[in-house]
């Protein structure tokens, strides 16, 4: 059973309560993320120390909005950790996207889906994904019930010490994601902060704008849904993006670009065997499921 954490108030107050309730888990994840970064760098021929990670965190932290920094500071204070440790735990995926360009790396990760109302059993939109996370992260996963002083309430799945990963808010907006690795990755706003900002919005346009804001660190694929039935898949690089409205049927995405224009940002030497196989397999399995599509059918298709 996942732990549920209730947060309310200002960004700092919510962060501090987050850190206080999950202090041990935040410490565990922060230490683990440093070790994962070191091991990833070593595997790709790049020497890396914890001190270097901390210095990168200090440099890049200030690129984020004040409310996000305040929440990270609250988490750090609540868990009695330096804010650099909290930030680096949040930033590992984007850090790896910048680092991977120094050497070849297999493209693996999550598989996501969008199902339009005309294809779902109850005529409601469906949105979801797998989560290709290290098994060691399971003890630090939590559900966060967020009631901010300003903005809609939200229900979020994430890891201890981190911002939004997957979630839905009371305005009927929901977000998900899977990773992409463009060649223009650079220090900038990390994807968890973008998702966090998107779920703080109360309308479709502002949520999409939050995900495509200037200054992104790397590329990600974002899923956006609205209770009224509107769905879109947003592919991004650090500096470019493309939006694919999903008005009918189903849409599957893995970890390579489907946009012809954005494929120019992929390294032609990267190993895409996993992501391309998963895309075709998910499409085949979903096509084989009984219609209309149900949540149970989606779980079976992705199992």
Spans of features found by a protein language model:
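Gly/Pro-rich turn-and-neighbor structural signature
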Residues: 77, 84-125
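C-terminal, well-structured catalytic/ligand-binding subdomain of enzymes
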Residues: 1-79, 117-126, 130-303
């Amino acid at each position: 059973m996942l732990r549920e954490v209730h947060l309310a108030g200002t960004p700092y107050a919510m962060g501090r309560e987050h850190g206080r309730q999950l202090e041990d888990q935040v410490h565990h994840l922060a230490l683990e993320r440093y070790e994962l970064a070191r091991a990833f760098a070593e595997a790709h021929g790049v020497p890396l120390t914890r001190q270097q990670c901390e210095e990168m965190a200090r440099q890049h932290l200030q690129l984020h909005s004040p409310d996000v920094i305040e929440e990270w500071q609250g988490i750090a204070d609540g868990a009695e950790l330096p804010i650099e440790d909290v930030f680096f735990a949040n930033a590992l995926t984007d850090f790896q996207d910048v680092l991977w360009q120094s050497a070849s790396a297999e493209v693996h990760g999550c598989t996501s889906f969008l199902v339009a109302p005309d294809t779902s059993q109850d005529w409601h939109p469906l949105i979801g994904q797998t989560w290709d996370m290290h098994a060691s992260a399971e003890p630090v996963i939590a559900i966060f019930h967020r009631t901010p002083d300003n903005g809609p309430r939200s229900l979020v799945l994430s890891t201890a010490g981190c911002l939004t990963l997957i979630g839905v808010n009371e305005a009927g907006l929901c977000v998900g994601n899977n990773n992409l690795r463009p060649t223009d990755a650079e220090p900038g706003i990390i994807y968890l902060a973008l998702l966090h900002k998107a779920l703080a919005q109360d309308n479709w346009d502002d949520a999409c704008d939050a995900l495509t804001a200037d200054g992104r660190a790397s590329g990600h694929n974002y899923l956006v849904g609205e209770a009224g039935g509107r769905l879109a898949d947003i592919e991004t690089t650090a500096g470019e993006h493309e939006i694919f409205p999903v008005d009918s049927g189903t849409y599957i995405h893995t970890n390579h670009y489907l946009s012809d224009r954005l494929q120019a940002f992929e390294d032609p030497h990267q190993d895409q065997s996993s992501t391309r196989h998963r895309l075709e397999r998910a499409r085949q399995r979903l096509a084989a499921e009984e219609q209309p599509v149900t949540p149970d059918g989606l779980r079976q298709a992705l199992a």
